[in-house]
Each structure stands twice: as structure tokens, then as C-alpha cells.
Amino acid sequence: MRVLVTGGSGYIGSHTCVQLLQNGHDVIILDNLCNSKRSVLPVIERLGGKHPTFFEGDIRNEALMTEILHDHAIDTVIHFAGLKAVGESVQKPLEYYDNNVNGTLRLISAMRAANVKNFIFSSSATVYGDQPKIPYVESFPTGTPQSPYGKSKLMVEQILTDLQKAQPDWSIALLRYFNPVGAHPSGDMGEDPQGIPNNLMPYIAQVAVGRRDSLAIFGNDYPTEDGTGVRDYIHVMDLADGHVVAMEKLANKPGVHIYNLGAGVGNSVLDVVNAFSKACGKPVNYHFAPRREGDLPAYWADASKADRELNWRVTRTLDEMAQDTWHWQSRHPQGYPD
């Protein structure tokens, strides 16, 4: 298939592009490089074994989107492009709604103009809000996300659901990720956050490699086994494979298809720290800090629907997530070159 991957040079997007190329698909990447670097493109080509076409541009540029979709006879769009820092979204809500909601609207309008009807959306477990039961199941009603980031993901899910109701020949997949971590096993591709990392694993990696002094663990008094927050961590390669499978199985299959992509088990912050210490062969400096407002004690996915319907399940362990992250970070302590 010919696939347009928005945000394809970002963390999850780049790993997914490699897996798409390895599976024989033609990949067209669109990215504005606001949170990624052009130097990842030759890495995608080398690891994928095939050349991806690249456009530097913004999903809010509807004319450009329409032109790309039409000129490249795109079959499917996988939509990663968007802003994703929960904390920053509280400070900059309008930027998040403009990028994530308005940007998706412009992209969908371009797809309608180009008659492209297969869409895979990079959603998030944040759409569940605070649920009374764990694990989270797709049939749960969506909650009230705490942050503008989470709200923007939920708004887009609602927009896409309404669109599919009005245009029943569309196939829309809403893939709800839990906590993507890890890196390509080659050690040449991984998460390269701009500025201070917002996510746990890249922060730990930067502490281990000497770029940061110590990891702040927010809260050690949660009602969990060791007092730290529990989350569902999924290896980015398993997540990338999930996109390929969803794209191949759901293409031209009308409907709204919702799947949790998670490991289906919870690990605490200290579990992750300990796995990383084992991977890098030295203790990782950390200190406890007060809880962050809005953080939940524990949640993880029920991913059995993806197993049942897509024949997808995770194959990589927390130890492998830590090992692959350390392999990437130790080989590339400053991330990708500018």
C-alpha cells in the first residue's frame, strides 16, 4: 500500500515507517520537524531497506495535504503528527487545540478532497480519564481527560466517529497507546526529545548517560506495591508492528475500529528504574518528589481485543525496553545530529 505517515520522523512515527518499509509498503512522510530532526530520514531508509519520500510541511496546510494525497495516490493515512506534552498543554492549550484538533480537521478535509478513506489515528489512553476499574477495556465510556492534550485526543476521536457515521464507507482505526518506550534494536533509532524529556524512560536514559543529575519520582505514597505510580509500558517496536497490522487488516473495512495497544501489565516507576539500572550496569540516581496533580495511581490496558481481532500482541519485555533504550542512548548520547 501507499501510506502517508504524518509525523513520520518523530519517535513512534519513525519506528513505524521502518516496519512499513520492511513489510513492502511505499511510505510518504510529512513532518514539520518541530519535534524531530531531518537526520533520522537516512536511518529510516537504512533500517527499512527502502527509500521513503519526505515532505517538510504542516498538516494545517490543507492545499499541500490534498496535493500529496492526490499526486502520490495514497491508500491509507497514519496520523501521528501532533503536540504531545501533557504539562506543556496546560500552559499552551490553544497551540494544542490548533495543532491536534484543527490540524486533524484540515487533514481529513484534504482526504475527502482526494477521496482517501482509510485513516489510522494515534490516540492515547488519556481518553479514558480516571476509570473506577482496571485494566482499561475499549468498551469503557471515555472519561474526562485532565489536560488539554488528553482532551484534544478525545475531541479528535469524537470528530472521527461522527465523520464515519456520516460517511459510512470510511475505515477509521483509533489506536489508544499506553506508554511507549524502548528503541530500535540496532541502537541507531530511538526517542530523542527536544529539551527536557517529558517521559520517564528517556529521562532515566539521560541521567544514566550523564546529561541529567537525578530523576525526580513524583509520589512514593500511592496505594501500589512500592508506593510509586504504575503504568503499562509498551516497546515502541511492538507499537509500530500494531500499526502495520491494523493498517493491513482494516484497509477498506468500513467502521470505527478501537484498539488498546499496551502490554496488558502494569509496572511501577521503580520497576522501570531497576530494569534500566540492570541494562546499563550501574545505579540510576533518583529522588522522591511530591505527587503531580492529575497523576493516577495505577492503570494498564486490556489488550485482548487487538490479540483476538488483529492477531497482535506484545513480544518484548520491560528488560528489553530498557536494554534497547540504553543501547540507543549510549551509542548516541546527544541523540540525532542536528
Specify the residue positions occupied by each region the protein language model found.
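Short, flexible, glycine-rich and Lys/Arg-enriched loop motifs at helix boundaries
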Residues: 38, 168, 178-199, 210-231
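Generic alpha-helical secondary structure signal
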Residues: 39-42, 50, 63, 198, ...
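A short, structure-level motif marking secondary-structure boundaries and short turns
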Residues: 1-2, 91-93, 144-145, 189-190, ...
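Short-chain dehydrogenase/reductase
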Residues: 97, 146-154, 190, 194-198, ...
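C-terminal substrate-binding subdomain of Rossmann-fold SDR/epimerase-dehydratase oxidoreductases
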Residues: 200-338
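Pocket-edge positions in alpha/beta enzyme catalytic cores
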Residues: 57, 69, 96, 144, ...
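N-terminal Rossmann-like NAD(P)+-binding domain of SDR-like oxidoreductases, especially those catalyzing
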Residues: 1-183
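Short, electropositive, low-hydrophobicity segments enriched in small/polar residues
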Residues: 11-17, 40, 61, 86, ...
